[in-house]
């Protein structure tokens, strides 16, 4: 079934200001529908929760506000951050273990990361990989061995910064980006498999159904919810639990302004429906949130070009080792450097990238001298010349003492020079509302490792669980591709099992 169009700005304001206050059970009367576990949102976290709850024997119903499953997960690249010794890693000749995986993720996910969740995720990663295989997700046993946002090949394994400084000094470099067998974006294939697995396990679905309010009984336990379906009010009784997997809040400008203003004015990585509805419904019951300022930011600077040249800020200065995971250089740029940002490359570097791997990226300016390029870019005279001269002097010796880019990407840049504008986007499509950046939110409801939504005292809100981007997962101030789909499904599964039994860990 086709997805309805993304909401207009006016519609998002109306939706944002609608009441999310909980409804008393005594005010409902007879419910229109009833089940044991009610899952709200049919992206990857919702599919995982529904699958596990149904497999545990619960009567499960999934509500999805769009016309079919998928959500923002289906529009993603489909990368899954998995490791610890999966069959794909072994087939590609890499030895990994949970402790090594943990050492990388603890650093890469940044300050204030949830180390308890990271530890569980790493220890359970091989089993989680097996679960994807059980759900019908296939992975090719081949490695994409160069920096990229997403391989256009069907390779099943990719590097996600593990082999770049400083992370290669903290953990043994092992690639952990697992990709479903698909050319290009694999999120759609991933969601086809996961949604089919959930319904195959026995979960029912109601699409075109938007949850609006949670229902509380006289003790304060979540007992169901109120929704709108085809313009009519519909009520749902959840005998055991409600699981919120409704996504983040990047499509809610008011919430962004309050919690994560760094994303204001940039593009949105979403299906247009990540408006924080689940977070708002839960907080209206007294639920707490965590890390609401944490975001993912993607700069449309092509890694294949960046690593062969340099990434500079608006003053012509390098600020990062360009072979690092591109999400890291994106955050460095947008959060900490004066824009605009430019990829500086020479003719040899540009031509060395296969045309199929250029993603339609073309230089905005090409000049014979750096002085001419500085003038075109509006940089201070001599700034870029100084940067390139310093870079070239050390690159001749295979060194990068300031930023530690790997020697295999180091060589002196020579005329003619080119500047590539990230704001032009890939395939000429523009990017980030003209800023060259787009992102999504990572903060959300405060949850236990079993998905129990916690209140401000740290106690569970009875009958309420959450996972995916509606919850605050493993992330601190950092992000790595595959950790959103990865922790959404991993902790979605835990939430589904806990919801089915009506409690958290014993």
Where are these regions (language model features)?
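Conserved redox-cofactor binding core of oxidoreductases
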Residues: 13-15, 120-233, 253-254, 395-420
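Glycine-rich FAD pyrophosphate-binding loop
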Residues: 55-76
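Glycine-rich loop(s) and the adjacent beta-strand/alpha-helix scaffold that form part
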Residues: 185, 229-299, 485, 491-494
């Amino acid at each position: 079934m086709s997805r309805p169009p993304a909401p207009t700005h006016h519609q998002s304001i109306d939706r944002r200001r609608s009441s999310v206050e909980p409804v008393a059970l005594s005010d409902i009367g007879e419910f229109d529908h009833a089940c044991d576990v009610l899952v709200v949102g049919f992206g990857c976290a919702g599919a995982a929760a529904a699958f596990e709850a149904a497999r545990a024997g619960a009567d499960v119903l999934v509500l999805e506000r769009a016309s079919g499953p998928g959500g923002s997960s289906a529009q993603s690249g489909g990368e899954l951050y998995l490791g610890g010794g999966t069959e794909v890693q072994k087939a590609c000749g890499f030895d990994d273990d949970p402790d090594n995986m943990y050492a990388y993720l603890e650093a890469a996910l940044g300050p204030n990361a949830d180390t308890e969740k990271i530890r569980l995720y790493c220890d359970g990663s091989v089993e989680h990989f097996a679960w994807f295989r059980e759900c019908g997700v296939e992975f090719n046993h081949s490695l994409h061995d160069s920096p990229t946002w997403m391989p256009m090949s069907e390779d099943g394994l990719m590097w996600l910064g593990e082999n770049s400084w400083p992370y290669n000094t903290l953990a043994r470099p092992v690639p952990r980006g697992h990709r479903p067998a698909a050319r290009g974006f694999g999120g759609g294939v991933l969601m086809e498999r996961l949604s089919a697995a959930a319904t195959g396990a026995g979960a029912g679905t109601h699409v075109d159904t938007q949850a609006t309010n949670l229902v509380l009984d006289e003790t304060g336990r979540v007992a169901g919810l109120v929704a709108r379906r085809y313009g009519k009010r519909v009520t749902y009784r959840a005998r055991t639990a409600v699981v919120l997997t409704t996504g983040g809040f990047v499509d809610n400008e008011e919430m962004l302004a309050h919690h994560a203003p760094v994303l204001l004015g940039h593009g949105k990585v979403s299906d247009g429906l990540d408006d924080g509805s689940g977070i708002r419904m839960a907080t209206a019951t007294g639920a707490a949130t965590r890390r609401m300022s944490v975001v993912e930011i993607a700069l449309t600077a092509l890694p294949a070009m960046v690593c062969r040249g340099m990434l500079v800020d608006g003053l012509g200065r390098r600020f990062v080792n360009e072979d690092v995971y591109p999400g890291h250089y994106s955050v460095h740029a947008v959060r900490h450097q004066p824009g605009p940002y430019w990829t500086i490359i020479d003719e040899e570097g540009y031509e060395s990238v296969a045309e199929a791997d250029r993603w339609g990226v073309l230089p905005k300016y090409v000049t014979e001298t750096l002085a001419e390029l500085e003038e075109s870019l509006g940089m201070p005279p001599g700034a870029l010349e100084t940067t390139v001269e310093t870079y070239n002097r050390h690159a001749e010796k295979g060194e990068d003492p300031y930023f530690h880019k790997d020697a295999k990407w180091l060589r002196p840049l020579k005329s003619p020079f080119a500047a590539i504008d990230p704001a032009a986007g890939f395939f000429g499509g523009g990017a980030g509302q003209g800023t060259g950046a787009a992102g999504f939110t990572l903060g959300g409801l405060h949850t236990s490792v079993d998905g129990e939504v916690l209140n401000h005292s740290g106690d569970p809100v009875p009958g309420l669980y959450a996972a995916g981007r509606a919850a605050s997962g493993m992330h601190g101030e950092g992000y790595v591709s595959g950790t959103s789909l990865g922790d959404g499904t991993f902790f979605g599964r835990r939430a589904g099992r806990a919801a089915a039994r009506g409690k958290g860990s014993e």
